[in-house]
């Protein structure tokens, strides 16, 4: 999408998108940026860039907006790839959001320097004298520069300024009814706009807020400075704006702190999701081990500073690339449910077999010379789910990276309470071994014996090959041909994404559609 021209009204509400999709410098390698851009549907790249930019918002709003879709060719790994990409975007949002917070703090300090305080205090004293008030304006002047105001204190000072304006003959409630405030939160979803007395003030302050998010170097514009005015309404409007920016900074600090904690805890949950994918492709053991180590480093850090999320993100992306190359379906919920069903059947857990009581449990492979028997409902027996490693000694049996997999199950429900029980799934290693045995044309017992006596890694043949020739296919190849490549929408230079109406449930969100980028 081309950048709006100077005359285009969308320019004031548009956010610049660079070739990196606004990922921060030094966060990702060019290879990983290209990987994410190629994986995400073209129609979602604008939203990715907007969220990457660090647009100030609450963490729950960020999570709600993270509806990133990967392209159809990556459907097999969608349930693992999309959470990894969303996590990466959240980290980018945190990094850029921290920079925006520093920019806002610096701009606020510049706009409320000693000279500005003195000018505002002098103006307030004139107002107080005109209204015969004995109050000291010092508290209000200091509150404008206070970046630790609570919501209650902020609202109290806003009401006080409203009362001063009303006493001067300026009814804020009446004057603000005809004003358009829709641009005030286009670039900042945390900003709580007070009521102002003129459209000029609203327009000027909205440009200031846009400059914060865009990290422009221009200082704040205020009515009293631009007009060189000592008029009470303009002084009070400026104080309202700076007071509200101070409160916004407090909210932004709290939001980034909550997001940082959420990202640390989410690293643990992501490890569980990726572990199921690892069991499907055991040859990714070394990569998953790095993912787990980096996640643990985040969780165990005691530093008050923001931890370094970059190594964890890089390890996850490298891991997911290997999962994609394995060409298997990674469906964590389905796999865990199937493991629970098989485990319940193996151990005779009454009430936990979930409909498998009358199902056929065992199948015999007639093509196997040992009349091998395998469980019908073992997901690792399906070559669309499990990629058998070439070297069994390094990846199967005791060499499998261990993690206790668990699954919750609703076991009782009354009018007052729902009770869940957490089941451990200790049979994962055994089920993986059975999947390997089937692919290697062995019985599970033979595989177990092989692993106990062989220590030298040897590639195991898993295809039906005789005399050096592969057996003819029994069935037709009905795989769908790859889709024709589509022209990428990103190009040289920069683009822009219009942010008006991007906020959830926005009243100005009209005519927005999500276009599929490929069939």
Swiss-Prot record:
- Its domain of life reads Viruses
Q: Which UniProt keywords apply?
A: Host nucleus
Here the segments flagged for biased composition (Basic residues) are: 510-519
Q: Please report the name of this protein according to its UniProt entry.
A: Protein M35
What does this protein's UniProt record list under function? Answer: Plays a role in the inhibition of host type I interferon production within the host nucleus. Targets specifically the NF-kappa-B-mediated interferon-beta transcription.
Where does the record say this protein resides?
Host nucleus
Pfam families on file:
Herpes_pp85
Classification of source organism: Viruses, Duplodnaviria, Heunggongvirae, Peploviricota, Herviviricetes
Gene Ontology CC annotations of this record: host cell nucleus
Q: Where is this region: Disordered?
A: 485-519
Chief localisation class: host cell
| Residue ranges the record marks as coiled coil | none
